[in-house]
Amino acid sequence: MADKFYITTPIYYVNARPHIGHAYTTIACDAIACRQRMLGSDTFFLTGTDEHGQKIERSAAEAGITPQQLTDGIAGEFRGLWDRMGISYDDFIRTTEPRHKRGVQEMFRRIRGNGYIYKGSYSGQYCVFDELYVDAAGPAAPCPECGRPTETVQEENYFFKLSAFEDRLLKLYTEQPNFIRPETRRNEVMAFVRGGLRDLSISRTTIKWGIPVPDDPRHVIYVWLDALSNYCTAIGFGSPDKKDQQKFAHYWPADVHMIGKEIVRFHCVYWPAFLMAAGLPLPRSIVAHGWLLFEESKMSKSRGNIVRAETVIDVLGNDALRYFLLREVVFGQDGSFSFDALVQRYNSDLANDLGNLASRTLAMITRYFRSEVPYPSSASLRTPADDAIARTAEETIASFASLWDDFQFSRALEAAWSLVGAVNKYIVDNEPWAVAEQADEGSRARLATILYTAAEALRIVAALAHPVIPDATARIWEQLGLGNISHFRLIDLKWGQLQHGTKLGKVEAVFPRADKSAIERMQQMEQQRTTTQAAPIAPAPTTAPSPVTPAVTTPAAPAPAATADGRISIDDFAKVEMRVGQVKVAEKVKGADKLLRLEVDIGTEIRQVVAGIAEAYAPESLVGRKVVLVVNLQPRKLRGLESNGMIVAASVGDRGLPVLAGFLEDVPVGARLK
């Protein structure tokens, strides 16, 4: 029996239309699922939409439609886009479906039956935007996740004993380090749990748009318990049907939950705790990717900087978008999207490198060998250059697999394109067009070896890249005379398997070069879509909440007015606002040896700060550490990132290495320095 592989996207919240931020997650999952199928795995790929909650209820009321009408429309747009993009999902779950309602209520019953749910009352703040109960002081206090004003809620609730799982969760993270990936997110989650867990309200009585609590229909189940359960309900959990039960037993637990970094807490703290409480196995790995930025800012409807996947597809095709997102963005880190960068990457890697390799290799086989793959020379007649390509190809097969399995898609593709570059150089160095002009038998054999080597390398690149650029590689496969690439299994991928005498298919360009007009067309299409596709719902981003205020950076502080001897007044000093913050995330800035990107909790919000402390501090050593932050500086960009604040540190020694300011006593986050 084939190994099973179950992968999921997050289910997308239907408060706005899909854009390439959603496409990024879905493309990554689709590529992983495709490669698993090529490996022969029994693969199940799930996506869908999250359709309940107070935010949807209010948005529908503001639009003058029912919640069901709103969710039907937006869910249809998500499904339609995935179908247009050729996304190979096996199921599309909607949380308004009866099968999901049945499964969520069964999840609630199991958790309650195991003694982890009790009834109480909640009085405090609630963020409608994030569908999140928050610890905040006073009415309209800002949400620590998104910064928006919270609402005061006082109602009877059911509570989940989240506090009972603190030790079990920490043990999970320690014993299974790959449960949360990348490591920066794992450190962030561990710091959060070590800070102490409070019991979680998991029902509402003041809204109606949701799934009723079993045996107590006045209560609606908390939207995150509802939403997270989709990973189980879609494969049969809670169904009375025996086939559904067998399906759940076969595919669960999930092998990969792919999510955006903004919903790490819900998936890595709440979800495993819910499953432990229900007595169900845990997913094997939760992989959190970074944000996709548009010209250095996070995409959001309120900013008006959303880019729709259809815009790129209409001009450059599916493969261009898929390749750019997985090659350009280092998975797990934030990545930047722009039309200029997209076209540059398309022309460089796809049109020039791979497209050129395919076109000239197949064209020369067509011309010199009547469209049949030639017979290569025996080993004794091969040159070191021939053997080097064969060796590089075998090494690439191995390195690609290792990098891909570690979710390093960009580096895996870089390895594959190194082979493309090596073969293009091999063709230039060996000049098959010149060899073809020689009439002797030895030259004919040499020409055959050169073109066989190039064609075999092209076959290997096509097989490796197929999960990323499926349309183009399917066409290359057919042009090589190999038929339908979906029948190929990666276990058979090794050098020398291309059979001589194979008749080529019709040879045509795979990636025509794009000019500057492509950029202009995409920009115009985006402007038109922005004005004509205004969604009839309240403005808000599509997936779950953003935990960081929009990326911002550290400028030099405006210098207070000084006297002639350099002293400033107490009033001037009072203008500088310094607060205690706690580092939640720390990671290196690509291409900058001295810079770290930090996410710092200052009590009222989480700030992104770029700090020049990398020479003195390893990123992992900073997570959970308290620092002093100047919080009222104007934002400034460093290395394409914005920093909103400045870390206070001393400059020590001849090299001026930074030493962070700290406290001998414990000081609460958000405390102001005076």
What do these predicted ranges mean?
Residues 91-102, 120-133, 186-187, 288:
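Short, glycine/charge-rich beta-strand/loop segments that flank catalytic centers
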Residues 2-47, 99-103, 146, 152-367, ...:
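Structured secondary-structure scaffolds
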Residues 541-674:
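Phosphate-backbone binding interfaces of nucleic-acid-interacting proteins
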Residues 114-166, 170:
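Cys/His-rich short segments
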Residues 476-572:
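Intrinsic disorder at enzyme termini
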Residues 74-90:
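A glycine-rich helix N-cap at a beta->alpha junction
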Residues 2-74, 93-109, 113, 130, ...:
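N-terminal catalytic cores of NTP/NDP-binding nucleotidyl/phosphoryl-transfer enzymes
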